[in-house]
Amino acid sequence: MTIVAEAVDLSHTYPGGVQALKNVNLSLSKGTRVAIVGQNGSGKTTLSKHFNGLLRPTTGKILINGIDAKNKTTGELAQSVGYVFQNPNYQLFSKTVREEIEFGLKNIGLQGEELRKRLIEALEIFDLKPLANKQPLSFSSGIRKIVALASVYAMHPPILFLDEPTTGQDHPGKEKIGQLLLTMANEGHTIVVITHDMNFVAKYVERVIVMAQGEIIKDGTPREIFSDYAVMEKAHIQPPQVFSLARSLASYGIQKDVLTPLEMAENILQRGLI
């Protein structure tokens, strides 16, 4: 697979001496869906913010398409790396949803028909057409996050980071975001989700990066990660409930590393347990 972004021997120390990252090495491949997980303070967000220039390495480097990002501005990096904050209030400031989406498009040089096409596409995909002329900050936190995601999506960044995208979302909202990420990855976008939502991880990502105390402690598939109790305990994360249930039902012939309720239902039916 083509590598589109790398962290090489990356360390970051905040003012005051707190070392948030310790010699992290990570490569991201084109068209993949990745989750970065770990407890608060493990370094997830600090690592992610290096890829779009919001933070700069204390030591080490970030490569975007093989090019050192140290001399790139955040504006230049934004054309390659989109970032949706955990708190959408940090990136919403326009008077209307329409203007919010247009702002990013104008920043990357779009105008005229292409800008209009991207705007309409984003409004339709995220069901925002009825809200296009309303003030983004007047919405619930869940809808504000959708607006922020739509504004970044409209720019079609090759790499997209989403910090806690399911926070404040109901089940249909989570499903919509998940399906969008699948579509974008199939189109060649690289998707990175920073999250505590292990059900979302189980259903929508293919690779999981586990962090603890500023280091990557494991890199694997969701099944591999959830099956490693030592890593889960060190990272202070819990597998999806259905995964734990499958473990307890293994003696009845249930596959012990079931990831989703649909997989569980299929296992039960295949074994004639109901």
Model-derived features: where do they sit?
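A short, flexible loop at the N-terminus of ABC-type nucleotide-binding domains that lies
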Residues: 1-7, 11-23, 71-73
